[in-house]
Amino acid sequence: MKHIRNFSIIAHIDHGKSTLSDRLIQICGGLTEREMAAQVLDSMDLERERGITIKAQSVTLDYHAKDGETYQLNFIDTPGHVDFSYEVSRSLAACEGALLVVDAGQGVEAQTLANCYTAMEMDLEVVPVLNKIDLPAADPDRVSQEIEDIVGIDATDAVRCSAKTGVGVPDVLERLVRDIPPPEGDPEGPLQALIIDSWFDNYLGVVSLVRIKNGTMRKGEKIKVMSTGQIYNADRLGIFTPKREDTDVLNCGEVGWLVCAIKDILGAPVGDTLTLARHPAEKALPGFKKVKPQVYAGLFPISSDDYEAFRDALGKLSLNDASLFYEPESSTALGFGFRCGFLGLLHMEIIQERLEREYDLELITTAPTVVYEVQTTDGETVYVDSPGKLPPLNNIEELREPIAECHMLLPQEYLGNVITLCIEKRGVQTNMVYHGNQVALTYDIPMAEVVLDFFDRLKSTSRGYASLDYNFKRFTASDMVRVDVLINSERVDALALITHRDNSQYRGRELVEKMKDLIPRQQFDIAIQAAIGNHIIARSTVKQLRKNVLAKCYGGDVSRKKKLLQKQKDGKKRMKQVGNVELPQEAFLAILHVGKDSK
């Protein structure tokens, strides 16, 4: 056991985690030169296209160190985006140490800080690594000073390397073996294995990634899931070298995969403990804290025949992504679908894309909303995650919206722009600290504003230099109203949105104007209105298509023309009473862009 090292690689987006993993795999000979590809651990097509890591991946490598010993390295490559921070904390729970990778040109960013604090809270050994020293802009001395000032860990002897060219990577491995402690645990004790992650394989059923904390796991043994008491047979187990390799035994301290013919998706939830059926452990390992979704949106299949397939797909996906929440929902405009909870907008986009790609579904998304806390006049407190569930205005005593605490790190020259943006987003400054040329800003900003487009606009006002990390802080009373959209005097539930009263006129008007361009013209006038309660705040009309009924009249009496026009008018009136309006998919997407273009 003293030759095992478990560690994660944590870093801000684009600081070179996945490239460093590639180098480690190459040096330790995990894959042959022919099998090597760039970002070999980003196995999903989506990850490669966007150049980001979404799922944490684990690899077991053998490293022949300079002291003549052979060490087994189990490492987990983690995502850098704030939306996937849950993946990071799960990966860290399986490790004794972490490599904190910092870009030697850009320096410390908000996500570096957040992930590093997560690692420190779990008492992990953090080894700082300065990456990209081959860049002309690299300034390792300034950055190591920054790590000490902002993060507060000793970085005087931080390893300097370039994952792209391979310079200094062997030093990273040596430092790992030296500084990160071996796993603790009792190889002779009863088996306790933590499920770090699981996914669904069409041939094998549920595949789980486990970290053996105590005892050993052998092929063919009866395994018991502690939370449900179910007993399964360990059919196959093994390690990733990134390829899946079978082994007969997983020893104490190792990280490996396990297949035990679980067909039920909820059979072995992530964060659960596995033990032996004949000699069970007394208590389960502490799992992971449940994450609360921050953003909710309705997802509906375009054709109602896909509902069953959509439900199965969500089940399989939620096995692989424990932070996804979903419950059935029906809408008069869109039929049956699911209300899903996500950690952020990027998470939502990724899930929608994965559903459409991996499971061949066509989906409509409604506008994302956050959770509001509502105090009703009866003294009850209810939590509302969609505009449709909001009680009528006269039943609401107080409406509270979630406030996010946002930590931003940015160069001084962009400070003015960023503060202006925060004020526009109704933010309140709580802290500001200067570290050399960097400024650390803390603002309390309503979650609804953060999830909408705050991140994109923060990046554009600071030319990409500012970085953001946010977490939920509290609920605060606020003057929020629901804006309904009426089409021909009928409310369309899927188009409603909750917004602040100050912005409601403007939002309503903008939404109505956008819808006007998107709804195809019919044989009769279509009135599009935005309303708060019974009060109409904006209206526009999609003009009817009409035939020129006077074309056949050459001269003649005016009463003849009047008669024809009146006849047409009556016909249109009748049509309007029975006609219904088909809304195109773009109309639902219009709400997503309300408030983005003009500011």
UniProtKB/Swiss-Prot annotation:
| Stretches assigned to the tr-type G domain | 2-184
Entry's PANTHER family? TRANSLATION FACTOR GUF1 HOMOLOG, CHLOROPLASTIC, TRANSLATION FACTOR GUF1-RELATED
- Principal localization reads membrane
Q: Give the Pfam families listed for this entry.
A: EFG_C (PF00679), GTP_EFTU (PF00009), GTP_EFTU_D2 (PF03144), LepA_C (PF06421)
What is this protein called in UniProt?
A: Elongation factor 4
**Which chemical reaction does it catalyze?**
GTP + H2O = GDP + phosphate + H(+)
Q: Which family does it belong to?
A: Belongs to the TRAFAC class translation factor GTPase superfamily. Classic translation factor GTPase family. LepA subfamily.
Query: What are the GO BP annotations of this UniProt entry?
Result: positive regulation of translation
Q: Which cell locations does it reside in? A: Cell inner membrane
What EC number(s) does the entry state? Answer: 3.6.5.n1
Keywords, ordered alphabetically: Cell inner membrane, Cell membrane, GTP-binding, Hydrolase, Membrane, Nucleotide-binding, Protein biosynthesis
- Report residues binding GTP: 14-19, 131-134
Membrane topology note: Peripheral membrane protein
Q: Which CDD domains match?
A: EF4_II, EF4_III, LepA, lepA_C
**One GO CC term on file:** plasma membrane
What PROSITE patterns does the record point to? G_TR_1, G_TR_2
Signal peptide (residue range): none
| Superkingdom of origin | Bacteria
Lineage summary: Bacteria, Pseudomonadati, Pseudomonadota, Gammaproteobacteria, Enterobacterales
> HAMAP family attached here?
LepA
Q: What does this protein do?
A: Required for accurate and efficient protein synthesis under certain stress conditions. May act as a fidelity factor of the translation reaction, by catalyzing a one-codon backward translocation of tRNAs on improperly translocated ribosomes. Back-translocation proceeds from a post-translocation (POST) complex to a pre-translocation (PRE) complex, thus giving elongation factor G a second chance to translocate the tRNAs correctly. Binds to ribosomes in a GTP-dependent manner.
